[in-house]
Regions:
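Amphipathic alpha-helical polymerization modules
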Residues: 2-241, 245
C-alpha cells in the first residue's frame, strides 16, 4: 500500500513538473513575441516618419529577465531543508526605448521660411495645449511660416521664440527675409531678432511630446547651442537609417 502511494505521488509530481515546464516554455515564447512586436512598432514608426522634417528615429534594446532559482521545499534527503535544484530563464524583455540624435540629411527647398539645424540644438516653441496651458517646447523641425500678424509660427500656428524668450515678430511689409548661420534674422537688411536655439547637457532629460516636439523634464539643464542655421533647407532622416533596426 505504501509503495502504491509513493508511486502515485511520483506520478503526480512528474505531471506537475511537465505542466510547469510547458507553462514556462509558453511564457518564454510570449515574451519573445512581445519584444518583436515592440521592435516592429518602432521600425514602422521610423519608416512612416522618414520624410518628416526634423524627425529623430527610435530604437529598442532587449535584455533577459533575471534567472529564477528553483527550490525544492523541505527536501527529505537533506533533513527536510530547502534545497536549490537549479535556475531557469523566463525569456527576454524590452530593455529601453531610445532615440538617435544623429545628424540627418539636408534638403534644399529655396523657401525663406525653412530652416535646418546642423549640429546639436533645438528651436524653442511657445506651445499651447487644448486645455489652454502654454509652455516652452523644443523641435528640430524648422518649417516655419509668417502669420497674419507677422509672427513666425510653426505649421500648427505655435509661436517660434527668439533668444529673449519672446515670439519672433517680423515686419509684414518686408520684401526680403534673411537669416545667417548664427540664427540672426534680418528683414530688408535690418536686424529683427535671433532664433532662441538651445541645447541640453543630457538628452536623457528630454522626452517626446508629440507633434514633432520635445519637452524638458525635471533635472534638464540647458546650455548654449553651437548649431548652424541653414536657411532654405529642411532636415530629414535618412530612409535607410529609419529601417536599419530591422
Amino acid at each position: 500500500m505504501i509503495s502504491v502511494i509513493t508511486y502515485k505521488t511520483a506520478v503526480n509530481i512528474n505531471s506537475q513538473e511537465k505542466r510547469s515546464g510547458m507553462v514556462r516554455g509558453l511564457y518564454t515564447a510570449y515574451t519573445g513575441l512581445v519584444n518583436q512586436q515592440k521592435r516592429l512598432d518602432v521600425v514602422s514608426n521610423n519608416l512612416a516618419n522618414a520624410t518628416t522634417t526634423g524627425f529623430k528615429k527610435e530604437g529598442v534594446t532587449t535584455q533577459s529577465f533575471d534567472s529564477v532559482y528553483g527550490i525544492k521545499i523541505k527536501d527529505a534527503t537533506v533533513g527536510y531543508m530547502n534545497q536549490n535544484i537549479g535556475s531557469m530563464s523566463l525569456g527576454a524583455k524590452i530593455g529601453e526605448t531610445y532615440r538617435s540624435w544623429d545628424q540627418g540629411s539636408l534638403r534644399n527647398t529655396d523657401s525663406n521660411y525653412d530652416f535646418a539645424l546642423s549640429g546639436k540644438g533645438f528651436f524653442s516653441i511657445s506651445f499651447t495645449n487644448k486645455a489652454g496651458e502654454t509652455s516652452t517646447l523644443y523641435t528640430r523641425d524648422g518649417s516655419f511660416q509668417m502669420n497674419q500678424e507677422g509672427y513666425l509660427v510653426t505649421k500648427d500656428g505655435d509661436y517660434v521664440l527668439g533668444e529673449s524668450g519672446d515670439p519672433i515678430l517680423l515686419p509684414t511689409d518686408a520684401s526680403q527675409l534673411s537669416v545667417d548661420s548664427t540664427g540672426a534674422i534680418y528683414a530688408d537688411g535690418q536686424y529683427v531678432d535671433t532664433f532662441g536655439i538651445v541645447d541640453f547637457e543630457d538628452y536623457d532629460y528630454i522626452e517626446a511630446y508629440g507633434e514633432n516636439l520635445y519637452r524638458a523634464v525635471d533635472g534638464a539643464v540647458t546650455k548654449d547651442s553651437d548649431a548652424v542655421v541653414n536657411q532654405g533647407y529642411i532636415c530629414l532622416l535618412y530612409t535607410s537609417d529609419a529601417a536599419d533596426d530591422k
